[in-house]
From Swiss-Prot:
Region (Disordered): 1-40, 354-433
UniProt key word Nucleus: yes
GO terms classed as biological process: endonucleolytic cleavage of tricistronic rRNA transcript (SSU-rRNA, 5.8S rRNA, LSU-rRNA); maturation of SSU-rRNA from tricistronic rRNA transcript (SSU-rRNA, 5.8S rRNA, LSU-rRNA)
Comp. bias intervals (Basic residues): 9-25
Keywords, sorted A to Z: Nucleus, Ribosome biogenesis
Protein name as annotated: Pre-rRNA-processing protein TSR1 homolog
Biased composition (Acidic residues): 378-412
Length: 788
């Protein structure tokens, strides 16, 4: 008998390993693996819960019914949405011009009927029984590109063979990605003309690598050189699965192809617009308001059908038919609550008191005449006085270091003389530097660096009691757990805004009525069969400037508002600073240009930390690495919605500052501004410490006695009593202090945004995102490269 054991052969298949991870998949992984298929367990779960046995044939029938239901829904969407597929052509790098690309595309089939409108180039393709409308915006005009993308079903990129993008192309892609992209098709003109197969594959892989780097599409690239390539491209544009933007799925919209105006009977300065185009998106509701970018919200009187200018088949013309008409239930144009001047029974100030309050007060050195005082730049004093009126001002005006001599020598006169010497040196510095240096930006860099080294630290004023200077501040035992009443000491502007009792429930109710599901709308909602038809929308009481702007640009996209979206409230947006912006952005001195969904407006924002909790710390400067929340007065916008944040420089150009999305509409968000007062340990006796330079009189020490002290090394303590009359105080800590420690005291005050919301009309505020000379040089380089 052999003593050796059995050994499996080399062709023996090993046993299957135990899949321990199989039962630990997440719901997302299971959904991805199923790819839309409904499992038997999911279908029979309700049957098992009611103790009803389901046969195998019944389960198969349920799966078949689910498939048929999905196919019927898809056919219904295709049947009712008979508007032409809207495609935006965007050329990147040294690629083909969109006009030349469309000329070649139109010659691939003799049956294509090409028509033109002021904003589109339309193809009627009998071979595919479909229509395609092309938009060719100027890529140097960001507003035109964004408008085209918001209205498009497909975005077609024309990539260069070198796969190299200019700096402007990369910035444009960043802006477009942040604003949201529809279905993407990537085309490479000239790819089919490369005869060498290896070189052709290298070019293809290089372009696909660039596309994957931008995380835009994994469908590969398509050539567009031969007739076969162009036919295949048209088929792809027509039959590819369209993934609508959230903006398109929620809001009815129209790309205006014709605009006419008639005078309003009520007001001669107003007109009634007749906007013609295809009805896109969910079913239109004549009771909802409509938004004209840059001009505001307006009411619709009626919607009627019109003759299609780009028909697939010629048919006898039909008369106009009213398909929706506004009634008494239509949305109001009220944006804010009207304040009652007598509300609260507050006595109105007299004219003498108003004049006295308007007088400008300045602190000047002793002996200064009134004529000299008129020339003193009082930025620091004005900032200090206005800080209690405008809560978003900075607290770092007095950053002079106190001399560590006898206490009696630290007088306000010494500080003022020191400030005078600083002003003289600054004047000499101004004379010596180059005029091209922006002194305001240099000052921002300095303040940002100081804030990074000593966050929120402010020197206690010597010539003013600290209890007066920081009278609107309070101490907190714990920033995380201490309570703060959100309805306490609200500004007057809070009486003008709207607030939801339950934001989530209101949003759920509004979203449930999208697409003609509102049973109370009556004749104001169009029938599903009219979705996608060419129609005329009549808009009432529109300013004449809208017509003038359209004549210049020939570019207008209309969006219908959801209920409540015309009302003003507090809008919170989660943003992240863009790497291309290297300038320090202060939270109080910069007015931003926001692109929120289809809205464009200007406003000052309060920047705060994006952290969990019910209280959030004010960010004095826009963070570079982490996300933050910008809070502004703005119309209500239901999340999710994309946000682009720009700033306007001294030359009138717009620079991308940050990108993000809408967080919520919540006026109860508590943003606290922290001010840190610091002192120096004068004498240390184990846990007992005498601290100086935090306060300069006995009354201030008694006033801030309840506030807890701490040190950067983590020690905690309290003020025990004042020592003398010049600001020394005896403190006690939980452990012994180090001689290099500083003693800190935190004070907090709630801040609110400033009500300065205004519509941003790019037609009235012409600005380029880059200098025109640079754009022309790029165009010349492209033309030379194409000729070579």
């Amino acid at each position: 008998m052999s003593t050796t054991g059995h050994r499996a052969g080399v062709f023996k298949k090993p046993a299957k390993p135990h899949k321990s991870w199989k039962g630990k998949r997440t719901k997302g992984e299971i959904t991805t693996e199923n790819r839309g298929r409904e499992g038997v367990k999911q279908l029979t779960r309700s049957a098992h819960s009611t103790h009803r046995a389901v046969s195998k044939d019944a389960r198969r029938n349920q799966l078949k019914m689910a498939r048929d239901r999905k196919m019927a829904d898809a056919m219904e969407r295709r049947r009712t949405s008979n508007a032409p597929c809207l495609v935006t052509i965007l050329s990147l790098g040294v690629g083909a011009r969109p006009s030349e690309f469309l000329k070649k595309l139109a010659t691939c089939d003799e049956t294509i009927v090409q028509t033109h409108s002021p904003s589109t180039i339309d193809f009627a393709i009998p071979r595919f029984k479909s229509r395609i409308s092309f938009l060719t915006p100027d890529k140097e005009n960001v507003d035109s590109v964004l408008d085209a993308i918001r209205a498009s079903d497909v975005l077609c990129f024309l990539w260069p063979l070198s796969a190299e993008l200019s700096e402007w192309d990369e910035q444009l892609l960043t802006i477009c990605k942040a604003a949201g992209l529809p279905t993407i098709v990537s085309v490479v003109p000239g790819l089919g003309g490369i005869q060498n197969h290896k070189k052709k594959e290298d070019v293809r892989k290089g372009i696909e690598f660039t596309i994957s780097k931008w995380s835009m599409s994994n469908a590969g690239v398509m050539p567009a050189d031969s007739v076969t390539d162009n036919l295949q491209l048209l088929r792809t544009l027509n039959e590819t699965k369209k993934k609508p933007l959230t903006l398109q799925a929620r809001h009815s919209y129209m790309l205006v192809e014709n605009l006419e105006a008639t005078e309003s009977p009520e007001d001669s300065s107003k007109i009634t617009l007749k906007a013609q185009g295809y009805l896109r998106g969910p079913e239109w509701n004549a009771n909802n308001l409509i938004h004209l970018p840059g001009f505001g919200d307006f009411q619709i009187s009626k919607i009627e059908t019109a003759a299609d200018p780009h028909p697939l088949k010629t048919s006898p013309p039909k008369g106009a038919e009213v398909i929706a008409k506004a009634d008494e239930k239509r949305q109001s144009l009220e944006t804010e609550i009207t304040l009652d001047a007598m509300d609260g029974e507050q006595t109105w100030p007299t004219q003498e008191e108003l004049e006295e309050a308007d007088k400008e007060m300045r602190r000047v050195p002793k002996g200064t005449s009134s004529y000299q005082a008129a020339w003193i730049l009082d930025d620091s004093e004005d900032d200090e006085d206005e800080e209690d009126e405008d809560e978003d001002m900075d607290d770092e005006e007095e950053d002079k270091d106190l001399e560590e001599d006898d206490e009696e020598e630290d007088t306000p006169m010494d500080l003022k003389s020191e400030a005078g010497e600083t002003t003289a040196s600054e004047m000499m510095f101004h004379d010596e530097i180059d005029e091209d240096i922006n002194l305001a930006e240099v000052e921002k860099y300095r303040k940002e660096r100081e804030n990074a080294q000593w966050p929120d630290e402010v020197d206690t004023p010597i010539d003013q009691p600290a209890r007066i200077r920081f009278q609107k501040y309070r101490g907190l035992k714990s920033f995380r757990t201490s309570t703060w009443d959100a309805k306490e000491n609200l500004p007057v502007d809070y009486a003008r805004i709207f607030q939801f009792a339950n934001y989530k429930n209101t949003k759920k109710n509004v979203m449930s009525k999208i697409g003609g599901n509102d049973v109370d709308a009556g004749d104001a909602v169009i029938d599903k069969k009219f979705n996608g038809v060419f129609a005329s929308v009549y808009i009432e009481n529109v300013p004449v400037s809208v017509m003038e702007a359209y004549k210049e640009t020939k570019n207008l996209v209309l969006f219908q508002l959801l209920p409540h979206e015309q009302k003003m409230s507090i809008l919170n947006m989660v943003l992240k600073k863009h790497p291309s912006c290297t300038v320090p952005i202060g939270s109080e001195d910069q007015k931003f240009i926001f692109y929120v969904g289809f809205r464009q407006f200007e406003a000052h924002a309060v920047l705060s930390s994006n952290t969990p909790g019910d209280k959030f710390k004010l960010e004095r400067f826009m963070p570079t690495e982490k996300t933050f929340v910008a809070t502004v007065y703005a119309p209500i916008t239901f999340n999710p919605a994309t946000v682009l944040c720009f700033r306007q420089d001294d030359k009138g150009r717009q620079e991308l500052v940050a990108t993000g999305s809408v967080l919520d509409t919540n006026p109860d968000r508590i943003v606290l501004k922290r001010t840190v007062l610091s002192g120096h340990p004068y004498k240390i006796n184990r846990r007992a410490v005498v601290v100086r330079y935090m306060f300069f009189n006995r009354e201030d020490i008694d006033w801030f006695k309840p506030v807890e002290l701490y040190t950067p090394s983590g020690r905690r303590g309290h003020i025990k009593e004042a020592v003398g009359t010049h600001g020394h105080m005896k403190c006690r800590f939980d452990q012994q202090l180090n001689a290099q420690d500083s003693v800190m005291l935190n004070l907090y005050k709630r801040v609110f945004p400033v009500w300065d919301y205004s519509l941003f009309n790019r037609n009235l505020n012409p600005s380029r995102f880059v200098e025109r000379s640079r754009v022309e040089s790029i165009s010349l380089v492209q033309e030379d490269a194409m000729e070579e």
